[in-house]
């Protein structure tokens, strides 16, 4: 696993890989942010792309917004999920459903409240290939839209970085590792080998 604070832009220097990447986006009542997320994913500088949105028990306009993208771009798939087993955490269950419908050799799990740079996927895949790693996770830039977020996000980030220093989480002699659930890029075979999201099905932090 690689979780790094180092920029993955050097992945852009790697040869382009002609590989299908499936992006899975879990969405529970995300009408405020899902359009921005999807539009940024569809603008990726990557030829072979599948975007799967799992609308998880939504009661707002999330499904309608995704449907608009489905109708104009055949790379987008909408999956409607109406229930969640008691033994599963909601997000993990939605991600498992998305993975079951994925066709790619690489799986990218991306949160609905994110906005991707056009080079994100190419840089991340290039860096994963360069390092020969089965899981690549990134630290993202955070946007604070509310005073409460502006107060709490820096404190939470500092706490995480003290527990999981980016320059140490990849060392083989450390039992403690860390990956950011906002973006996790898996090799499909390895993801299935370790049990996928079923292995952490009742964990709030997957």
Located regions from the model:
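Long helical/loop segments within the catalytic core of UDP-sugar-dependent glycosyltransferases
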Residues: 77-100, 123-198, 203
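Short, well-formed alpha-helical segments that are part of the catalytic scaffolds
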Residues: 4-10, 30-43
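Donor nucleotide-sugar binding loop of glycosyltransferases
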Residues: 30-33, 58, 117
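Cell-envelope/extracellular polymer assembly enzymes that use nucleotide-activated donors
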Residues: 19-22, 50
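Short acidic donor-binding loop at the edge of a beta-strand
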Residues: 103-106
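N-terminal membrane-anchoring/stem segments of glycan-assembly enzymes
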Residues: 1-17, 153-154, 162-166
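Acidic donor-binding segment of Leloir-type glycosyltransferases
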Residues: 38-85
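Acidic donor-binding/catalytic loop of UDP-sugar-dependent glycosyltransferases
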Residues: 61, 110-127
């Amino acid at each position: 696993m690689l979780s790094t604070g180092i920029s993955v832009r050097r992945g852009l220097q790697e040869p382009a890989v002609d590989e299908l990447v499936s992006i899975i986006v879990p969405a529970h009542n995300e009408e405020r942010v899902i359009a921005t997320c999807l539009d940024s994913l569809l603008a990726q500088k990557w030829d072979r792309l599948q975007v799967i949105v799992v609308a998880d028990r939504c009661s707002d306009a999330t499904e309608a917004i995704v449907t608009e993208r489905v109708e104009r771009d055949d790379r987008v798939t909408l999956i409607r999920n109406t229930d969640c087993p008691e033994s599963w955490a909601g997000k993990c269950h939605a991600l498992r459903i998305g993975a079951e419908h994925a066709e790619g050799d690489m799986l990218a799990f991306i949160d609905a409240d994110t906005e991707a740079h056009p080079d994100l996927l190419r840089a991340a895949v290039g860096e994963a290939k360069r390092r020969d790693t089965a899981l690549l996770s990134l630290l993202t830039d955070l946007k604070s839209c509310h005073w409460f977020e502006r107060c709490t996000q820096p404190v939470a980030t500092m706490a995480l970085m003290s527990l999981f220093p980016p320059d140490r989480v990849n060392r083989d002699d450390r039992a403690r590792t860390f990956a950011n659930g906002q973006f996790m890029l898996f090799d499909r075979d390895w993801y299935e080998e370790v049990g996928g999201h079923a292995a952490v099905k009742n964990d709030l932090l997957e």
